């Protein structure tokens, strides 16, 4: 996760203290985030086709699937290190600090897949393996962000204490999946299928950010700025699916 901000407060005369010159500043930084795994139940629908090779127990086919996953992984109280500086009254001052993100979330909401497969049939069943592309909707969420800077060793909420920002971005990304499974025919019309699938989205980058403002307090005047950030990575999804299928 990478994050930066730009600061543009105007000149200000506080109720307490001397007048202050305007400030122009910026900071940036980044960090790695280790997301925990998430387990949940989700619905799935699929349609497929298979056919035997001539005079053989071997078969080929393809399966199109839709999975409404709605799986979210969350890291709370994530710190994004920052370094930068500001200019006030012609004097430049360097500083470092952190952006505090109360919760950072990566979600995979839904996924389409199309997987050709090869299999081998038995008396009333067949087993198969396959692989193919996926198209997934993912979501990146950063909730309740506050930017802190260390001025002379004292942490200061640059974006305003209690003045948080939140961002959420959805996008569709390509990926790939592989599956292995088996189908058992209950009769000529119905079958039961059990399969394991693992998929991985492509490495994607999400841009997020926007303006923020703080009304000021008795010491400091109003501040405005812009958050600018990116998040990059991929999502691995593993599923075990049990389905009842109609044969036609």
Show which residues each predicted segment covers.
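Residues on the lipid-exposed face of transmembrane beta-strands in outer-membrane beta-barrel proteins
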Residues: 3, 45-51, 64-66, 110, ...
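Extracellular/periplasm-exposed beta-strand and loop segments of Gram-negative cell-envelope proteins
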Residues: 5-40, 68-110, 136-173, 201-239
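Mid-chain, structured segments of secreted extracytoplasmic proteins
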Residues: 39, 46-48, 58
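Short loop/turn motifs that connect adjacent beta-strands in outer-membrane beta-barrel proteins
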Residues: 52-60, 123-124, 186-189
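Membrane-topology and secretion signals of cell-surface/extracellular proteins
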Residues: 54-59, 127-135, 144-150, 175-176, ...
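Acidic helix-start/capping segments at beta-turn-to-alpha-helix junctions
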Residues: 60-70
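Exposed beta-sheet edge/beta-hairpin loop segments within beta-rich domains
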Residues: 118-121, 170-172, 182-185, 233-234
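A structural feature that tracks compact, well-ordered secondary-structure segments
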Residues: 193-199, 203-209, 245-247
